[in-house]
């Protein structure tokens, strides 16, 4: 067998303008294409003026004509890209249907797109098998993990980290989900919701269209729009600044189902850091009492009713008023039992 001194003498190979093709010879169109490398049957075989492209694998960048600085490694990677630039596709069918710029897809079927609609959204990052698989117009998304954001079509500026994270989102934007199946538990999976932050495996929003919910902790679920949820239903204590304590600012509180939404003076009843001004007590006012270890609110009208129900001072400790052999008499601060013989009007 003769030794080849030039690559061009090999069947299905071409060296031209600092470019190299092995596996096919597209010499009829490559006169103005510079500094590219292709390895594989039909890899980069339609190029005309595009430069600095790299294609490895059958049908990799096969429709590229004028785009520059693309890297496609794997069967049908960046297959339908034709005129756009600065894409990286590594893995079987990664960015297969794309004709957008600035995307990075690593993993089989990562950002693959659909056969009916070309990918137009750019500047996305998809790492993991089927990550951002069905994306079409969505832009500036980051999906890391198998099937993360797999059903996104037009949502923008989302970040999903973890297997299946934010998988059911289609059009929601500005969401951040971190953790295995975060926002993808099968209950209230985010689809169109926006501005949500879910951190922890199996975290969920309160609704598929939930908005501005912050949910932190394994298995925790958002409760409402514009709310923060810390921990799941098994959490029994929440510490601020570890065990040192911290100042918590809030316009109101709900304690055991009872709302406290008034002034700082009325909220801060423990240390008295803010003093309430004196006021005239009315029947509708309420006081806080300890009922056998449980703090309860009692209306002043109820206090008045109780005090009024006391018919004698015997309810007080070391006190006696009236009674047999003690007519119209009052004794306070002394033994009240024993013999009280005809002690009247004392």
Task: Label each PLM-derived region with a short phrase.
Residues 1-12, 251-320:
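Fibrous stalk/shaft segments of extracellular and virion attachment machinery
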Residues 5-252, 309-346:
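Glycine- and small/polar-enriched repetitive beta-structure motifs of secreted/surface proteins
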């Amino acid at each position: 067998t003769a030794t080849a001194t030039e690559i061009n003498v090999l069947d299905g190979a071409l060296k031209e303008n600092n470019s190299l093709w092995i596996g096919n010879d597209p010499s009829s169109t490559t006169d103005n294409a510079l500094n590219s490398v292709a390895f594989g049957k039909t890899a980069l075989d339609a190029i005309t003026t595009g430069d600095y492209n790299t294609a490895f694998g059958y049908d990799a960048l096969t429709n590229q004509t004028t785009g520059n600085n693309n890297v496609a490694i794997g069967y049908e990677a960046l297959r339908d890209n034709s005129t756009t630039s600065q894409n990286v596709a590594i893995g079987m069918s990664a960015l297969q249907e794309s004709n957008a710029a600035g995307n990075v897809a690593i993993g089989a079927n990562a950002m693959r797109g659909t056969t009916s609609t070309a990918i137009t959204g750019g500047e996305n990052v998809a790492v993991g098998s089927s990550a951002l698989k069905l994306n079409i117009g969505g832009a500036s998304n980051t999906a890391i993990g198998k099937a993360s954001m797999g059903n996104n079509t037009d949502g923008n500026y989302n970040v999903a980290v973890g297997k299946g994270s934010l998988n059911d989102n289609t059009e929601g934007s500005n969401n951040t989900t971190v953790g295995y199946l975060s926002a993808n538990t099968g209950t209230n999976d985010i689809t169109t919701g926006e501005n949500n932050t879910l951190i922890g495996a199996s975290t969920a929003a309160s609704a598929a269209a939930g908005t501005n919910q912050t949910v932190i902790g394994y298995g925790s679920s958002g409760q409402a729009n514009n709310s923060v949820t810390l921990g799941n239903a098994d959490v029994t204590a929440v510490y601020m600044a570890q065990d040192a304590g911290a100042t918590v600012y809030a316009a109101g509180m709900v304690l055991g189902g009872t709302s406290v939404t008034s002034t700082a003076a009325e909220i801060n009843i423990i240390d008295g850091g803010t003093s309430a001004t004196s006021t005239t007590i009315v029947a509708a006012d309420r006081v806080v009492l300890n009922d056998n270890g449980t703090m309860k609110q009692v209306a002043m009208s109820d206090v008045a009713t109780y005090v009024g129900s006391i018919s004698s001072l015997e309810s007080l400790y070391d006190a006696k008023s009236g009674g047999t052999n003690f007519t119209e008499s009052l004794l306070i601060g002394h033994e009240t039992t024993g013999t009280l013989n005809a002690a009247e009007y004392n």
